[in-house]
Amino acid sequence: MSDNWIVQNLNSALNTWNEKLAEIWTLLTQSPESFKGGDIWNVTTGINGALTAIGYGLLVLFFAAGIVKTCGSFTDMKKPEHALKAFIRFALAQGAIMYGMELMTALFSIVQGIVSTIMAQSGMTNGGATELPAEIVEKIEAVGMLESIPLWIVTLLGSLLITVLSFIMILTVYGRMFKLYMYTAIAPIPISTFAGEPSQSVGKNFIKSYAGVCLEGAIIALACIIFSVYSASPPAIGDTSLSAVTIVWNYIGELVFNLLVLVGAVKASDRIVKEMMGL
């Protein structure tokens, strides 16, 4: 472990990146029930239960509105095929509200299985670690006092960029987890729209959107795996006869570009899912 301040600063930024990358892998394999000890999940299920009663009320409202919209007269409603169709729709919508939590949990478990399979097949458990090459360390340690001033500025800028990218990436993954909680909490309201034929599109969009949020985990896992393979070889040092400032600047520039590729892929996971699946 080098005692050089510049080396320590760069290592600290890289450690932050590695920690956030490892945290992403943990979050992707964690269920909402176990996240942060399950306290958020308990609050979410409580809200879901409270909104279920409102969902039943809206169920009747959407059902009645659907009957009025689809049946031109009371005579149409008395037809057996119309009455049976309306009854089946009402029963299915009621069941969806009653077992909505179980249905959403099952959908999440299916996608979680996809994520676990992707990770297991890749053979990676923590996304790999980015380390400062020994050649860079030697170059930095050989720098004199005056030459270290511009090197200090370059290192500070690079460390700041790496740290900011680390937090942007992890915030995106945390945002996905929070969206899962919000979808689960509010679920009875949009699900109740299945009771009416004119309003069922709201429920369909809700299910598709929730499936898209779940699938974001698979896209993020793929992005991390591809990045780990892509960045397995550290940025090339280039001409070792160059000054330490130039070498470090080139190294940080290429490293930040690689990190930007991953951050961009992670942040675009929702858009990628929509383009792939139309969700």
Describe each region flagged by the PLM.
Residues 1-10, 80-100, 203-214, 269:
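Alpha-helical transmembrane segments and their helix-start/interface "positive-inside/aromatic belt" motifs
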Residues 1-58:
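Binding/recognition "hotspot" determinant
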Residues 44-52, 84-88, 92, 141, ...:
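Alpha-helical membrane-interface segments at transmembrane helix boundaries
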Residues 53-65, 161-162, 180:
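Hydrophobic alpha-helical transmembrane segments
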Residues 58-94, 186-200:
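Hydrophobic transmembrane alpha-helix segments characteristic of membrane transport
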Residues 93-186, 220, 224-278:
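Non-cytosolic segments of integral membrane proteins
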Residues 191-208, 272-276:
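Alpha-helical transmembrane segments
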